[in-house]
Amino acid sequence: MSKDFIINEQIRAREVRLIDQNGDQLGIKSKQEALEIAARRNLDLVLVAPNAKPPVCRIMDYGKFRFEQQKKEKEARKKQKVINVKEVRLSPTIEEHDFNTKLRNARKFLEKGDKVKATIRFKGRAITHKEIGQRVLDRLSEACADIAVVETAPKMDGRNMFLVLAPKNDNK
């Protein structure tokens, strides 16, 4: 669990602002008085806002509260989607069929919700014709325009030119 709460005897403050299990404020009480009220109700005294003046404590069933918190965190983790970046490597002199195969792979990755990094590696003197690589990447981004947006425009990195495509949000 990401946040552990201070409970019962572990609370250091002399007086606390007390809230009962229904959310009603019982006012400012001494720590001892608050512990007695919690004990009478067979519940725990939990410090929920330690930085307030005076600190805020709530009377609740700590075991049940912790279980609920863990359940909420688990649900939040389930809803988080891990975004992977898949790479598609191209060359500036790519043939039509090879381009279509790479395009099909890129579209498949985008439809699954992954980002796609399209990389063109320039070999030898091909680096002098960057505009050819630029055209290949532009063609790829135009072919995926219906399901993706360009996150990073084509740019050079050493002998490589790359472009990052992200899936459009209205897909999911």
Curated annotation (Swiss-Prot):
<keyword id="KW-0396">Initiation factor</keyword>
<dbReference type="InterPro" id="IPR019813">
    <property type="entry name" value="Translation_initiation_fac3_CS"/>
</dbReference>
<protein>
    <recommendedName>
        <fullName>Translation initiation factor IF-3</fullName>
    </recommendedName>
</protein>
<comment type="function">
    <text>IF-3 binds to the 30S ribosomal subunit and shifts the equilibrium between 70S ribosomes and their 50S and 30S subunits in favor of the free subunits, thus enhancing the availability of 30S subunits on which protein synthesis initiation begins.</text>
</comment>
<dbReference type="GO" id="GO:0005829">
    <property type="term" value="C:cytosol"/>
</dbReference>
<keyword id="KW-0963">Cytoplasm</keyword>
<dbReference type="GO" id="GO:0016020">
    <property type="term" value="C:membrane"/>
</dbReference>
<dbReference type="InterPro" id="IPR036788">
    <property type="entry name" value="T_IF-3_C_sf"/>
</dbReference>
<keyword id="KW-0648">Protein biosynthesis</keyword>
<dbReference type="InterPro" id="IPR001288">
    <property type="entry name" value="Translation_initiation_fac_3"/>
</dbReference>
<dbReference type="InterPro" id="IPR036787">
    <property type="entry name" value="T_IF-3_N_sf"/>
</dbReference>
<dbReference type="InterPro" id="IPR019814">
    <property type="entry name" value="Translation_initiation_fac_3_N"/>
</dbReference>
<dbReference type="Pfam" id="PF00707">
    <property type="entry name" value="IF3_C"/>
</dbReference>
<comment type="subunit">
    <text>Monomer.</text>
</comment>
<dbReference type="Pfam" id="PF05198">
    <property type="entry name" value="IF3_N"/>
</dbReference>
<dbReference type="InterPro" id="IPR019815">
    <property type="entry name" value="Translation_initiation_fac_3_C"/>
</dbReference>
<dbReference type="GO" id="GO:0043022">
    <property type="term" value="F:ribosome binding"/>
</dbReference>
<comment type="similarity">
    <text>Belongs to the IF-3 family.</text>
</comment>
<dbReference type="GO" id="GO:0003743">
    <property type="term" value="F:translation initiation factor activity"/>
</dbReference>
<dbReference type="GO" id="GO:0032790">
    <property type="term" value="P:ribosome disassembly"/>
</dbReference>
